[in-house]
Amino acid sequence: MRILLSNDDGVHAPGLQCLAAALRTVAEVHVVAPDRDRSGASNSLTLARPLRAMRLDNGDVRVDGTPTDCVHLAITGLMEEEPDMVISGINSGANMGDDVLYSGTVAAAMEGRFLGLPAIAVSINSHEGKHYDSAARAVLDLLKRLGHMPLPANTILNVNVPHLPWSEIQGVQATRLGHRHKSEPMIRSHDPRGRPIYWVGAAGPEQDAGPGTDFHAVRSGYVSVTPIQVDLTRYDAIDTVANWLRDEDPA
């Protein structure tokens, strides 16, 4: 198996390096990742300038672009043979609920799926970085399952792992995305010259986080595996919108 591995924390991030080492025990691994932290880059592509890629001494490739750039460049411009799968992570910090809309980790996996490949995004529910090995083991277990039963078409697995030793993980649950309240307000400050600057506020608190959600699974000590897709169409609303558009007198 040939795996393309990327992330949004940067090519030197310990989560990526831990996962690369684990994956190399079962597969041929090609690392193509951003040259720096690109958290929150979502699905953005670099269009206004060329991308530069540099191969490091260990064979990994760093790119001065976004996670989506990295996967797109690797598959369509760098790799001589197409990978069998794209994996993104291990991200430092969870990507659950509405967070997936902003996540560069999820976006890298999504780009792989968009280019026709099975894809997994994996994150750990902490920024401390003590238990990346638990997340790596969860990915290896998923790969074994995928060897017996491939993913349904157009499916990305968004995996979130509790920040626990593997011996304390309770199991694995299939989940849906939870939801948060809206984000906290922007934080206003001033630069050294007194000019206003703004920091993005913290994510909103959990709102829909009951049983069945990714939030609940991880909080309960389970690995959360959420199937997501590229197609954002809300099919159950098409007829409603069609009727709304046919209304000749909106008033």
Curated annotation (Swiss-Prot):
UniProt cross-references to InterPro entries, sorted A to Z: SurE, SurE-like_Pase/nucleotidase, SurE-like_sf
Annotated family: Belongs to the SurE nucleotidase family.
Subcellular location: Cytoplasm
Cofactor section: a divalent metal cation
Annotated GO MF terms: 3'-nucleotidase activity; 5'-nucleotidase activity; exopolyphosphatase activity; metal ion binding; nucleotide binding
A GO CC annotation given for this chain: cytoplasm
Residues binding a divalent metal cation: 8-9, 39, 91
Record text on cofactor binding: Binds 1 divalent metal cation per subunit.
Sorted UniProt keywords: Cytoplasm, Hydrolase, Metal-binding, Nucleotide-binding
Chief site of localization: cytoplasm
EC number: 3.1.3.5
Protein name: 5'-nucleotidase SurE
Catalytic activity from the UniProt record: a ribonucleoside 5'-phosphate + H2O = a ribonucleoside + phosphate
Domain of life the protein comes from: Bacteria
Keyword Chloroplast: no
Role: Nucleotidase that shows phosphatase activity on nucleoside 5'-monophosphates.
Keyword Mitochondrion part of the UniProt annotation: no
